[in-house]
Swiss-Prot record:
GO terms for biological process: endocytosis; hematopoietic stem cell homeostasis; positive regulation of receptor signaling pathway via JAK-STAT; response to bacterium. Interacts (via OCIA domain) with OCIAD1/ASRIJ and STAT3. GO terms for cellular component: endosome; Golgi apparatus; lysosome; mitochondrion. Residues 1-22 are annotated as: Disordered. It holds the Pfam family OCIA. Has an essential role in the assembly of mitochondrial respiratory chain complex III. Is also required for STAT3 activation and plays a role in cell migration. This is OCIA domain-containing protein 2.
Length: 154
């Protein structure tokens, strides 16, 4: 009978990696798989799209407007450098404003994967090892029953 239970434990743990090879994000109960490739893909898309769709156009438009204002005489050109300092500053400000204006779009892309990312350092539960507090996690990380319990509504 003891050999049957030992064999049952081996079958149960056969699909789990050994503890020495488990990552910090491994949870035996939820089997949460963090899609790091998807996260890096979203970050790369956000960087490229924010550059091409917002930062570059804002920068070019602000530089053209500033050059036009200097040419029309509304802004004074520097005697040594001409309009270059004002145009360069306008370009930098336009670039920065373009990047900042795209933050909301990138946040909405990350919210699409919110459930998958919640255990990987995003959201209020980012310090927890598992999304679900299983018995193995409680034992492994020494979680107490007092700290994990939530107050009742009554």
């Amino acid at each position: 009978m003891a050999s049957a239970s030992a064999r049952g434990n081996q079958d149960k743990d056969a699909h789990f990696p050994p503890p020495s090879k488990q990552s910090l994000l491994f949870c035996p109960k939820s089997k949460l798989h963090i899609h790091r490739a998807e996260i890096s893909k979203i970050m790369r898309e956000c960087q490229e799209e924010s550059f091409w769709k917002r930062a570059l156009p804002f920068s070019l438009v602000s530089m053209l407007v500033t050059q036009g204002l200097v040419y029309q005489g509304y802004l004074a050109a520097n005697s040594r450098f001409g309009s270059l300092p004002k145009v360069a500053l306008a370009g930098l400000l336009g670039f920065g404003l373009g990047k900042v204006s795209y933050i909301g779009v990138c946040q909405s892309k990350f919210h699409f994967f919110e459930d998958q990312l919640r255990g990987a350092g995003f959201g209020p539960q980012h310090n927890r090892h598992c999304l679900l507090t299983c018995e193995e996690c409680k034992i492994k990380h020494g979680l107490s029953e007092k700290g994990d319990s939530q107050p009742s509504a009554s």
